[in-house]
Amino acid sequence: MSTEKLEASEEPQAPLANTSETNSIKGDTENIVTVFDLANEIEKSLKDVQRQMKENDDEFSRSIQAIEDKLNKMSR
């Protein structure tokens, strides 16, 4: 079989990818979430939870202290 026929083929070749598909892929890169983005969101969420837990703990400690103070006053 001769390769001349393959090289000189007049048949139009289909593109490997549709140009509208490649354009939409380029536009979709803005919507891609990276592992770094996820790690940052998780870290931010954990810090928010930690801050809220500290605030709750401080409020609870103040409440316990107030109860103890009242009990001490009553026992005198």
UniProtKB/Swiss-Prot annotation:
Tell where it localizes.
Cytoplasm; Bud; Bud neck
Q: Does the keyword Acetylation apply?
A: no
The reply to whether Flavoprotein figures as a keyword in the UniProt entry is no
**Any idea what this protein is called?**
Uncharacterized protein YOR304C-A
Its GO biological process terms?
A: actin filament bundle assembly
Q: Where do Polar residues bias regions lie?
A: 16-26
The alphabetical list of record keywords is:
Cytoplasm
Its UniProt miscellaneous note says: Present with 656 molecules/cell in log phase SD medium.
The ranges of region (Disordered) come to 1-28
- The species this protein belongs to is Saccharomyces cerevisiae (strain ATCC 204508 / S288c)
What GO terms fall under cellular component here? cellular bud; cellular bud neck; cellular bud tip; cytoplasm; mating projection tip
The principal location of this protein is: cytoplasm
